[in-house]
Each structure stands twice: as structure tokens, then as C-alpha cells.
Amino acid sequence: ANNGTFILRIDDTDQERNKPEWIDYIYEQMADFGLDHDITFRQSERLDRYKEVAEKIGTKTDNGYELDMGEYSMVILRNNGFPTYNFCSILDDYDYDVTNIIRGVDHIANEVKQHLIWDKICEVEGDKTFPVITHAGLLFEGNAKLSKRKGNGTTEDYKDFSKAAMLNWLLKFGWSHPDPLFDKKHPTLSIDEMIALFNEGNISDRNCKIDKAKLAFLDKKWKAMERRGNTAKEVVVESKLLKFDEFSK
């Protein structure tokens, strides 16, 4: 929608929770869903850059390199040479000229820290505009947040569903079109249509509960469309197979 560059960053600096097969799985899932990135990099490949900037803006201590934040200090580079989350994330954004970021509402507190680090980076590397950050609501199953740490946030749980149906299903969780009748007019969208219509200003920061029954309903109708060789519009308008209001309530 912004005609921008899609950057896939692999956060692999936590060595205890980093396995090659997990990274391969990310690439595979992105490809399966047709989410083609323009640039990809791993944070573990940028350790020299993190150290370079940490030495410029931080102070060497027993804990590594720390940044003076006034009332407290923040470790930005550990003694093992690996950066902390907020430091490497915002330095990546700076180096790659990132303009727009979408994160979960659980990262709101991090934005304050990243602003402070960004200002320090700009002092030694040159001024740049801080990215526009939009916070989206989290996905819950029951009363538990979907989380890879808890093992309930993997796409493997949804492998039998149509990828096209899943993308439409996920889009409806936290994004809405300003036209209140849009969903009934366009209950199914292609990836290209999603990109053209998407506006981060219409993202909701409310948490959403997953209802697999609604996904199953959409998946059934989508597969019926594929068997018939129909377009989404033909299924909705002519066959009346899919009524968005049946699964959007």
C-alpha cells in the first residue's frame, strides 16, 4: 500500500532459543503464504555493526556496554558480544531506513526506550526520522495469548486450511475498511487486493480471540470456490456460497 520495501529480519541473537530449523521454517511459511520479501538479513550477521555503534554511544561496564538514560542505565551490548533487543532492533531500523513498523501492543513500552536509543544513534551517525509505529492487538486462543514460547502460536496447527482463507481470516482480526459495507461487498480478497487496500491507520489495537469454527467455515467455502473454478466475486454474487456476516459476528 505504501509502495515500500518488505524487509524480513531474523531476530536470532538469543542463542538459547535459536535453532537453524526454526529459521528455515520461517522462510518456508513465508513462501507458502506467498509473502515475498525484498530484503532479508539475520541480526547475528550484524554483530560488528552493533559493537561499532555501542562503543560510540555507550560506556563499557562489567555488564557490557551501557547507555546512560539519566535516572538509570540500559545495557545495549552484552559481554558475549550480542546486543539487547531494543538496541539492535532500532539500529536495524536506522540502518535500513525503515519508515513504517507494525508491532503488537505488548511492545508499546519498548517504543519509549527505542526513541531514546534512536536519539543517541542520531547524535553520532546523523539525523534520521524515527519510524511511524502502529500497534496491533494480540491474538488469543481462549484466555491465552498465542505465543511461540508456549507452543500455541505455530502455523503447523493450521496446515490443513487453505492459505488464501487463512490470510483473509487473519486480515479481518485487526484491520477494517472505513466503508462499513465493505466486508459484505468484498468478503474475500487476493493478496494483491489486500496490499492495495491496506492502511495501517485502520488497524485496531484491541485484542482478538481466535474462533477456529469461523476459519473452518471460510475454508470450506473457499475450497468450494476453487473446486468450481470460480472467482471469489462469482462465489459471493452468483452462488451465494459465502456470506461474510455469517462468520464475522
Where do the language-model regions lie?
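Residue-level detector of secondary-structure boundary/capping sites
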Residues: 17, 45-48, 105, 157-161, ...
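Active-site cores that bind ATP or allylic diphosphates and position pyrophosphate for catalysis
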Residues: 8, 55-155
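Catalytic adenosine-cofactor/nucleotide-binding cores of aminoacyl-tRNA synthetases and other
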Residues: 109, 121-125, 132-249
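A local structural micro-motif
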Residues: 7, 38, 126-127, 178
